[in-house]
Each structure stands twice: as C-alpha cells, then as structure tokens.
C-alpha cells in the first residue's frame, strides 16, 4: 500500500536537504505542479529537467547539488543495444526498479507522487508513466 502523503513529504524534504548539502548551490523548494497526463514533454520539463536538463543530457540546474550526476537520458537506447528500454524506464518511474547510481534515492520515485496527483486513478498514473517514457524515448540520439 502506498502512503502518498508520507512519500510526498519525504520527497519534498529530500529536495530541500539537497540544497543544504550543496554549499555553493541552493535548491529552492518548489511544490510539484500538476501537469497534463497527456503531455510527456510537459511532465519532463516540470519534473525531470531540473536534474536531467531540458535536453535530457544531465545538465539541469540542480545537477551540481547531487552526489551522483544525473543520467544522460538521451543514450538509453544506445546503451541497450539500440532499443529503448521502455519497461525498465517505466519501472524506474514507478519505483519498482532501484538505481544504484542514485545511492540514497536522490531521484524522486514518481509513481506514488503521480498516484497522489491523480487522486488514486490508476489509469491516469499509467498514462503519465507511459507518456513520460515516450517523451524520453523521443530524446534518444540517432
């Protein structure tokens, strides 16, 4: 059972604490903005670009404050034999797959946040994850 309020609070606390650890960089707390589940691009810009950059290459404004550099999301297909790892990306977004590179879970687990945002509408959560994954797939280098 997901506990969205507790997880959401933990994610916000994590974001705030990142600023404290990065002495030169201050991360301002921003509440999660509700976006359209139909737009993978809108979700990426609002939820992912702060760390991964608008181009998905890992150079977002909060990247320097992280212990481990954010992944370059434009080479996921390249690293997977030329095929975009749709299932793996979905698992990461839902929180089903752990990321060793993220160490202490610096990357928010979006599944529970999407669940809270959609007020428990499983179809909307799945739509968000599918459309965000499709947008990340569109960023892949050729």
Please provide the spans of the model-predicted regions.
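C-terminal capping alpha-helices of c-type cytochrome domains
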Residues: 91-92, 103-142
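Hydrophobic h-region of N-terminal signal peptides that target proteins for export
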Residues: 13-21
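Stable alpha-helical elements in mature extracytoplasmic
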Residues: 36, 44, 85-88, 125-128, ...
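Sequence/structural segment immediately N-terminal to covalent heme-attachment motifs in c-type
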Residues: 34-57, 89
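Bacterial N-terminal signal peptides that target proteins for export
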Residues: 1-8
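Sec-exported extracytoplasmic/periplasmic mature domains
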Residues: 45, 49, 78, 94-98, ...
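Electrostatic cytochrome c docking/interface patches
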Residues: 22-43, 81
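Gly/Gly-Pro-rich "capping" loops immediately C-terminal to redox-active cysteine motifs
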Residues: 41, 57-90, 109-121
